[in-house]
Amino acid sequence: MSRQLNIDALRQNFWKEEYLREKMLRCEWYRKYGSMVKAKQKAKAAARLPLKLPTLHPKAPLSPPPAPKSAPSKVPSPVPEAPFQSEMYPVPPITRALLYEGISHDFQGRYRYLNTRKLDMPETRYLFPITTSFTYGWQLGPPVKQELVSCKMCRIESFFRKNGAFALLDPRDLAL
């Protein structure tokens, strides 16, 4: 639809009235519903603000009642904490040093570190015993390539129609 450029006084007055009427409708709507919209916006904004919890001051520790000094009691020895044990053996220092040499963008740093860690066998990296996923996935060895054996005539005989349908396309496509 092309734009009409022939605008006369009648059409210009029509558009002026239409514009003023829409403007008045917007003002009336804002006067009626503006306060409700602002209230909803404030409620949503308040819901989006993070909840501030009151600060709790530490309570003063209560002093324990004085113990009678007639008999010295045995103080239990502190329970030894179990050392933190990760799933993997610690990284050798030579391999760890690769982290700090260069950046990954230049195939150094973290990139070289991860590649050298990947070269280690999982059995030498992990502390826990071999699971079924170790046996199935990591002990299969390299994949064996199988060459596809196919002959052209097998494809032609099995793919193309033998009843002559669409024979007009290419006479070589017809397998008789």
UniProtKB/Swiss-Prot annotation:
Coiled coil: none annotated. Residues 55-80 are annotated as: Disordered. Residues 61-80 have a biased composition (Pro residues). It holds the Pfam family SPMIP1. InterPro entries: SPMIP1_C. This is Protein SPMIP1. The gene is SPMIP1.
